[in-house]
Amino acid sequence: MPEGKYSYHEPVLLEEAIASLNCRGGGIYVDGTVGGGGHAALILERSAPDGFLLGMDVDGDALQAAEKRLMPFGRRKTLVKANYADMRKVLADLKILQVDGILLDLGVSSHQLDAAERGFSLLKDAPLDMRMDSEAGRSAYDVVNTCSERELKDIIRKYGEEIMAGRIARAIAEKRKDTPIKSTTQLAAIVAGALPGGFRHKKIHPATRTFQALRIYINNELSNLHRAIFDSTDCLKPGGRFSIISFHSLEDSLVKNGFRSLEKGCICPADMPVCACGQSPRLKVITRKPISPCRDEVEANPRSRSARLRTAERI
């Protein structure tokens, strides 16, 4: 397999993300979204000869792909089926007190998008699912067919930032009266049909934001990310790096504000003359502006175009 190409998923911002971690021999690192193992493999290469990596993912398919790709690194890695929000517990179970770096890549993998049966892609006809862990939780089918019209409107508006959320929710509620909405293409057509003509000729498919909203809601993505930022920071050694690759404004805003909050420390009101909360800064922000893919990467991998990398360092 050519260097930099992966059959499961091509990692985004590969060099930039790994460079941001300042990998060194003997270091301990966590890839909380190990996917096909692309980022993890380079972390292990850069932390040779005795660096260690914990790879986590809720997707069983991803872990199988990562196990195969990382096999040459032998006992220098451990893979665990778990959500990155539970990183502190997983590390405690492994009796690892602190680590030198943490990486999260929040994007849906190419494999998840291309595997029609996972139900992530609006362009491939498949049963509505969208669960990162296909064995747990409610599927997109459950949400689309059982949530009230008001609940659907709130989900689509909050997590998809879709200004036509009301029209879309109404169209879904009307359509499912006749028969359950079962497939991705069926849902995509309903959403597209609910929008005025001017909304159907933009660069992205008219159902993109609705599919994003459902995926985020079903997988608790934003709450898991918030928990990971504030809990996992304490797992870092002083000088350890926390790097996160986000793919849409909701994620990027959460990462930016989370890092800034942990850099500030004090949460007292601005008009208080003396700090009463006792909270001290825990991070130093390294990337004041996020790092984006270069033109060559976007041309080679169009799915990388919206990626943003932010890094902070443990104080």
From Swiss-Prot:
GO cellular component: cytoplasm
EC number: 2.1.1.199
Superkingdom as given in the UniProt entry: Bacteria
An annotated Gene Ontology molecular function: rRNA (cytosine-N4-)-methyltransferase activity
Record's keyword terms, sorted: Cytoplasm, Methyltransferase, rRNA processing, S-adenosyl-L-methionine, Transferase
Pfam family membership, one: Methyltransf_5
Leader peptide range in chain numbering: none
SUPFAM superfamilies for this protein: Putative methyltransferase TM0872, insert domain (SSF81799), S-adenosyl-L-methionine-dependent methyltransferases (SSF53335)
Subcellular location per the Swiss-Prot or TrEMBL entry: Cytoplasm
A Gene Ontology BP annotation from the UniProt entry: rRNA base methylation
Catalysed transformations (reactions): cytidine(1402) in 16S rRNA + S-adenosyl-L-methionine = N(4)-methylcytidine(1402) in 16S rRNA + S-adenosyl-L-homocysteine + H(+)
Enzyme class: transferase
Binding site for S-adenosyl-L-methionine: G37, G38, H39, D57, L91, D105, Q112
Record InterPro entries: RsmH (IPR002903), SAM-dep_MeTrfase_MraW_recog (IPR023397), SAM-dependent_MTases_sf (IPR029063)
Reported function: Specifically methylates the N4 position of cytidine in position 1402 (C1402) of 16S rRNA.
Family to which the UniProt record says this protein belongs: Belongs to the methyltransferase superfamily. RsmH family.
NCBIfam families per the UniProt record, alphabetical: 16S rRNA (cytosine(1402)-N(4))-methyltransferase RsmH (TIGR00006)
Protein name as annotated: Ribosomal RNA small subunit methyltransferase H
Organism: Syntrophus aciditrophicus (strain SB)
